[in-house]
Amino acid sequence: MSENWYALTPDDVAAKVDVDPAAGLPAAKAAERLAANGPNALAAEKPAPGWQRFLAQYKSYMQIILVAAAIASLAIGQITTGVAVLLITALNALGGLRQQGKAESAMNALQSMLKTSARVRRDGTEVKIDADQVVVGDVVLLSAGDDVCADGRIIEATSLQIDESALTGESVPASKSVAVVTDVNPVLGDQSNMAFMNTPVTHGSGVMIVTGTGADTAVGGISGMLKSAPTTKTPLTRQLDTLTLWIAGAAGLTIAIMFALGISRGDSTQAIFTTAIALALAAVPMAMPTVLQVILSSGARDLAAHGAVVKSLDSVETLGSTSAINSDKTGTLTMNQVTVVEVIDPSDRYTITGIGYGLDGEVQHTAGSTNTIEAAILPFLVANDAKLVNGKVVGDPTEGALLVLGHKAKINIEGTQDSLPRVATLSFDPTYKLMAVFCEAKDAAGAPVIRAFVKGAAPAVIGRATSALAKGASVPWDDDLSTRADAQMTRLGGQGLRIMAAATVDISPDGFDPTGDLLALVQGLQVTAIVGMIDPPRPESLDAVRSAQEANIRVRMVTGDDVVTGAAVAKQLGIEGEAILGTDFAALSEAERLERIDGIGVVGRVAPEHKVLMVETLRKKGAVVAMTGDGVNDAPAIKAADIGIAMGTGTQVAKNAGRMILTDDNFATIVRAVSEGRKLYDNMLKYIRFMLVALVTYVVTFLLASVLNIAGGQPFTAREILWINFVITAPVGIALGLDKETPGLMSRLPRLRSASIMSPAVITTVGLVGLFMAVAINVLIVFGENQYDTLGVASTMGLVAFSMMLIIAAFECRDEKASILRVETFDNRTLNITAVIEVALAVLIATGAFLPDLLGTVTLTSGQWLIGASPALVLFVGWEIGKLIARRRSGHVAAP
């Protein structure tokens, strides 16, 4: 049933859903509706069984090729090789499954948040029922401490306030009333006569008629968006999939050539299959998943130490490509601690230093001559039910901010409150927008009075005023004073400040009835002051936003607050761009959104669908988008973003939808995480360049050996290939992945979503280096066989050559253009140690006892070993010459 319930009167709503609010639904009618529409619950997301998720890990091209190679190995009797390869695929699958298992369903977390019971009227009596039995038309009773069980139209409200922060992002509880909302298509935060499922009642009481249950609620709509939000692969993952396919294709073509040549030469089928299996193993980067997981795990540990916990390792990689951050305002860019920054009365003006709930600020008297601020702010302190406990506010955050003001003014708040015994309270209500407490006091002559201390929205308080307090004396509230007050409020409002006013009025004790019409007594007020307050930016947010901008990352503020407040905070933080309402952004055509998005810096009063729309628009523009949030309303956009970031203090729904959790809720941590992500992405590219050199060398080496019939077409055995992959390239790759950050990394442009890891320069380098290494290996094998008349010596020399050239390649791959003949080349201690170990192993495979038996190599003389290692020196010289040419062409300056 889709209706604009907020636009209907309570009587119209009751008629629409066919219920008598006084009696509630008849039990029989409720049962009919329950049977027709189903329970008031959200559909749970059923996870796939563990075995299905395990088998799903075998859908990647690499896993398929490895399984095929293992089966072929077993078929021709190479049991050890086949079993080893199957174990490798199982380890890869378990690694992927382990990461997948950490991501709990956001939908199921949403389901678990729903309340379990509700108080309703049925057949004229109040009954308590399970929340999933609530139906449209039920009359639900609400009181402080309850969670709203469904969406409903409020028909009675007594000082009713509901915390809707999880749905709207607004940190202050929403005041509710029964009045019709006349706005057109208001966002949830502006529907003041509606209550929404799963929001807690914080104050007062009320009655509502249920208008939506289950999937037809605001929370249900969010659940639907979560269900429809696609799970996206990271940019690097997509490119590696494509790269693996290309390499597999090249290997497949080489294998076909090998088969054709082998058959034409009369080679045995088993020999041909053995060679084909060896090439298949060589052409697949089987160690890559392990190496990448080690690299990303290291980054994840570093991030966790700085307050950012990643749930999936590929999120670290995505951070490195982030080009746009859509950030929530409250608590992320700001402190989520309302702070009074200015106090104004008719004769004086004060600015207040310090931020948040800390008491270390002070009151600075910037205009006027009154000796003390106490009389001006006293109503804010007396008409106040909050408490400050260990730097935290217990109660309403706005009242807490006013208490902090009192402490900064050196006022004994508790003593002042005790000296003015409270006899009655008029609670805040959105219809009159103020609060008043009535206390026993004495007037200037010492006569007893009932003094009302009033605080509330400035227009509401001033509208009941006849005078003001100026320099300790009462002055009439005339046109001049009204004009001055309006000017000050306009100034404060333009700065995004929330404005409140305070006042007093003395009432005769005679005939005062604390249970009577207290609102009628709040007349003829004497205004004492107006205050401006704001949730201030975090001290570190300004530098963090600047750092993001210097890294060419566009920061946008997405907030549930109004546009003026958002724009004011954005200006303080240096966030550029126009401020626009979420509804206005959604009303644009897709072409207009794509055209205007670059100029937008703040989006206010956003609904969940607006946030998703922003993410989708930016992604269509080619941006890699990070989205932060903490509420249920943020979860769909968090899930839709390339990197969803949830606040540690946020809802479990948001945390489950996100890929990263900020334990300190701090925007600066996001920028630090992006820096770490860029470093790891850059290091992974170093590893990928190194890995590609090895893969191209493999394929070309086998191709040349087959065409020229060198070493029987099989330059390396399967055991030697596994050795190279897991004992040489894997440790070296990990060392590259743990490299230090390249200077100037954060000043680079973010990597475009469409940018290829295979740039023309990389293709040229990898192709030339791989070709040289392949030719060198085959030449050495031919030379060794002719010179020493034994294939064993020749093949071992080829393996030594490959090993030593890979060590040179590791150092050269650290930078595409910079020479390795500089001090910085050896600042990676892990790589230095790894290189020394690899050189030692290259010696042992040709001189020791155990490794030659394991690999099938033979013992070399020192002269033979040096000949085998000599191509590494030639490779070094050639690579350095190539880098020198590249530097001169690009004007790149580097140490020689």
Model-derived features: positions:
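Conserved cytosolic catalytic headpiece of P-type ATPases
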Residues: M1-A22, I154-M194, H306-I450, A470-D480, ...
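Non-lumenal N-terminal regulatory segments of integral membrane proteins
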Residues: M1-E126, D132-V135, V140-V148, R153-Q161, ...
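Soluble-to-membrane junctions at the N-terminal ends of transmembrane alpha-helices
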Residues: N40-I71, E104, E126-V127, N185-M194, ...
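Helix-interface capping motifs at the ends of transmembrane segments in multi-pass membrane proteins
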Residues: I64-L87, W246-V284, S297, R301-G307, ...
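Hydrophobic alpha-helical transmembrane segments
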Residues: T80-K115, R122, T232-K329, V338, ...
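Conserved beta-strand/loop elements of the cytosolic catalytic core of P-type E1-E2 ATPases, chiefly
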Residues: G95, T125, T211-G214, K227, ...
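Membrane-embedded transport module
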Residues: T372-E374, G577-M627, A641, G648-A818
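Acidic, divalent-metal-coordinating active-site segment for phosphoryl/phosphodiester hydrolysis
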Residues: L542-A544, D562-Q572, E609-T617, G631-A641
